[in-house]
Regions:
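Conserved beta-strand segments of alpha/beta enzyme cores
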Residues: 34, 75-77, 136-139
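Charged phosphate-binding loop/patch that engages nucleotide di/tri-phosphates or the phosphate backbone
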Residues: 113, 117-119, 123-142
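Short, hinge-like loop/turn segments at secondary-structure boundaries
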Residues: 53-55, 97, 136-138
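Short, well-structured N-terminal submotif of metal-dependent ribonuclease cores
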Residues: 1-37, 49-65, 130-133
């Protein structure tokens, strides 16, 4: 099953000093079905890694080049943000409790739409947020 990498995983892959850098690289090396990115995860990665407040800040151009190189790999697919979060079959708004959960729920819905799994470092994502999501649609790296 192809994997949509969330922003936290992309950051860990690009930041050699990130605590989860080795874990994410080991996981990626075993991923045989390929991986995907989307505008939300790419923009989030660029924004966070290039912020002056980020502990291992990288110049924006360096982050962009790193992502471009990774995306050139034949195992990569780019997915446009194509889920309507307000559609009746997408997010379960009754189960979302905090605004901070919306992006994670959206990314999970995008993975479900592509019959893929969302790969994250975030242990707080609930399958109940997305209609049709099963355990196969979410992988938390720990």
């Amino acid at each position: 099953m192809r994997a949509l990498l969330d922003t936290s995983v992309l950051i860990a892959l690009l930041d050699a000093n990130h605590l989860q850098h080795p874990l994410c690289h080991r996981w990626l090396a075993t991923q045989q079905d390929g991986w995907a990115s989307c505008p939300i995860t790419l923009n989030g990665c660029i924004r966070i890694l290039s912020q002056p407040q980020y502990p291992n800040r990288l110049p924006m151009q360096t982050v962009v080049r790193g992502l471009q190189e990774a995306m050139a790999h034949p195992m990569h697919s780019f997915w446009p943000d194509a889920v309507n979060p307000l559609a009746a079959h997408a997010l379960d708004w009754q189960r979302l409790m905090r605004p901070a959960e919306i992006t994670d729920a959206y990314l999970l819905a995008l993975a479900v739409q592509h019959q893929a799994c969302l790969v994250t470092l975030d242990q707080g994502i609930s399958l109940a947020w997305v209609q049709g999501a099963t355990a196969a649609h979410l992988q938390v790296l720990v």
